[in-house]
Amino acid sequence: MAKTPSKKAAKAPKKAGSKRNKRVETYSSYIYKVLKQVHPDTGISKRGMSIMNSFINDIFERLAGEASRLARYNKRSTLSSREIQTAVRLMLPGELAKHAVSEGTKAVTKFTSN
């Protein structure tokens, strides 16, 4: 009995201007780093990471929307750290807002000093 050629279709050669798959950017590496700082012996599942990523995207969109609204109310065309800080104070409850503002201020100070 003769061996028959495989039935897999040959891939078409790539065109010069063919589109590449767009990379999906996530916060997973940052979530993992924070998790290891807080609980070094704890892991996270793919589904848990996906939920955390969605959560961060949601909070980011809400804060950006609120900051944008604040800038529009004050007839500003540029978002500054002040609008972001006010949006954080409006969106997050009590202690969480205080911690977020202090961490944000610390990050901005570190960024501008380098």
UniProtKB/Swiss-Prot annotation:
* PTM comment text: Monoubiquitination of Lys-110 gives a specific tag for epigenetic transcriptional activation and is also prerequisite for histone H3 'Lys-4' and 'Lys-79' methylation.
Under Pfam families, the record lists: Histone
Keyword terms? Acetylation, Chromosome, DNA-binding, Isopeptide bond, Nucleosome core, Nucleus, Ubl conjugation
Q: Which domain of life is it from?
A: Eukaryota
Tagged with keyword Ubl conjugation: yes
First-listed, main subcellular location of the protein, grouped into a coarse class: nucleus
Cellular-component GO terms for this entry: nucleosome; nucleus
Q: Name one GO molecular function term.
A: structural constituent of chromatin
Give the InterPro entries listed for this entry. Histone-fold (IPR009072), Histone_H2A/H2B/H3 (IPR007125), Histone_H2B (IPR000558), HISTONE_H2B_site (IPR055333)
Q: Which residues carry this modification: N6-acetyllysine?
A: K3
Q: Where is this cross-link: Glycyl lysine isopeptide (Lys-Gly) (interchain with G-Cter in ubiquitin)?
A: K110
Acetylation as UniProt keyword: yes
Tell me where it resides: Nucleus; Chromosome
Q: Give the residue ranges for region: Disordered.
A: 1-22
The function of this protein is: Core component of nucleosome. Nucleosomes wrap and compact DNA into chromatin, limiting DNA accessibility to the cellular machineries which require DNA as a template. Histones thereby play a central role in transcription regulation, DNA repair, DNA replication and chromosomal stability. DNA accessibility is regulated via a complex set of post-translational modifications of histones, also called histone code, and nucleosome remodeling.
Quaternary structure annotation from Swiss-Prot or TrEMBL: The nucleosome is a histone octamer containing two molecules each of H2A, H2B, H3 and H4 assembled in one H3-H4 heterotetramer and two H2A-H2B heterodimers. The octamer wraps approximately 147 bp of DNA.
Give the record's family classification: Belongs to the histone H2B family.
Q: What is this protein called?
A: Histone H2B
Q: Which organism is it from?
A: Olisthodiscus luteus (Marine phytoflagellate)
Q: What is the lineage of its organism?
A: Eukaryota, Sar, Stramenopiles, Ochrophyta, Olisthodiscophyceae
